[in-house]
């Protein structure tokens, strides 16, 4: 629809797979068609279902024997899964991406385990206070999440110096409230560690124990490790086009112009969100082509697309479940109405981070607004419905003056010429900032779509809202530049919003 200046891979010939020729994984319940979009190694199937020439990559004998310990309990959902309890030790037999084959040292049973539920013994990953692959900004978000209090802490890997670590601690400041302090952990040539050169430790575990007894120069004594949410089970890689009967719709969460959203369960075990599309909303073929692209976009700030049901209408889109629902509904709720401005800015930064990833992938969202951002239990934001707008066939939507088209969120060049680019997404992000800072109010209050189109053509922009800082309004105005090429990148927007409160978000502390 219109001109698309961002590069796209509309020709999927290299990745297209005829599902009829693909091997399937039989279970006692149904048949699953393998995900045709995944370039990762598939979760292995029994040997009699392997492709010709395909074999398990078994470890060499001298490499065998990696022992892992369970960080969380796991109840198997497939006949070939290995269930285990927290703390149970297992021997890894084969590694296959997100699913590993392992043998329990206690029960002697073998089966497949989710690799993100375990950690190798005698490594930092077994410690509840160690957070692997987490940025400094996300460390702050985790520590400020509900359930943590002053003294909560975590150890993370340094983003800038490979092999180094940092300590992040939640503190309380009467002037600024809850703040996060960061300390660099320095290493000695002999393998020891220290924060202050006055006292060194042979290992990080000993360092933690010391600072749990006394602050000794830190902002406060370390208390409880930061709460770590249980990770999502890896999705069954064989399940892309899944049977409708494998999905149980449990609770209706909302309804929109093109369908409904439900909380449901996949195979009675995995909680998911299910978007059901009204018949005729889009062609199955066009949707599947777009879904093939959507499936490859995986980032912490994007809602993950798991599977689809397309053999007959209504189409089901299966995604990860987000407990707090849409950002729009959350902002209008009693809980959301109590969120203070710094957290609202953080919501904006998280969304900018997700959009910066979409920008790097040369993709376009086309319908960025608070209704299409979801919120987790720990108040993490994730972008949803990216790319779906491209394949909607409803006349009231495809006609840009139609009643269903989101005029108030759409850039002038997209309204007038159908020219959707990542820069038209930047315009929409500016409107989304208005939604956030006004706790979910409709943009251009009191104006009709026709009024808005006319006003924009004459250079009108929404004025600054009463509780909106000048610096944030300046960002909005940058997003609403008439010339698309003059609008900022999402990478720039993320950096500005991440550091919006640099005066109060603690920099690295001096050595105590």
From Swiss-Prot:
Major subcellular location class: membrane
The entry's keywords: Adaptive immunity, ATP-binding, Cell membrane, Cytoplasm, Golgi apparatus, Immunity, Inflammatory response, Innate immunity, Kinase, Lipoprotein, Membrane, Myristate, Nucleotide-binding, Nucleus, Palmitate, Phosphoprotein, Proto-oncogene, SH2 domain, SH3 domain, Transferase, Tyrosine-protein kinase, Ubl conjugation
Region Disordered, residue ranges: 1-45
Catalytic activity: L-tyrosyl-[protein] + ATP = O-phospho-L-tyrosyl-[protein] + ADP + H(+)
SH2 domain sequence ranges: 129-226
Localization (cell): Cell membrane; Nucleus; Cytoplasm; Cytoplasm, Perinuclear region
Annotated membrane topology: Lipid-anchor
SH3 domain location: 63-123
Residues carrying lipid (N-myristoyl glycine): 2
GO biological process terms, semicolon-separated: adaptive immune response; autophagy; B cell homeostasis; B cell receptor signaling pathway; C-X-C chemokine receptor CXCR4 signaling pathway; cell morphogenesis; cellular response to heat; cellular response to retinoic acid
Post-translational modification: Ubiquitinated by CBL, leading to its degradation.
Tissue/organ expression: Detected in bone marrow-derived monocytes and macrophages (at protein level). Expressed predominantly in B-lymphoid and myeloid cells.
Gene Ontology cellular component annotations, sorted alphabetically: adherens junction; cytoplasm; cytoplasmic side of plasma membrane; cytosol; glutamatergic synapse; Golgi apparatus; integrin alpha2-beta1 complex; membrane raft
Name this protein carries in UniProt: Tyrosine-protein kinase Lyn
Species for this entry: Mus musculus
Gene name for this UniProt entry: Lyn
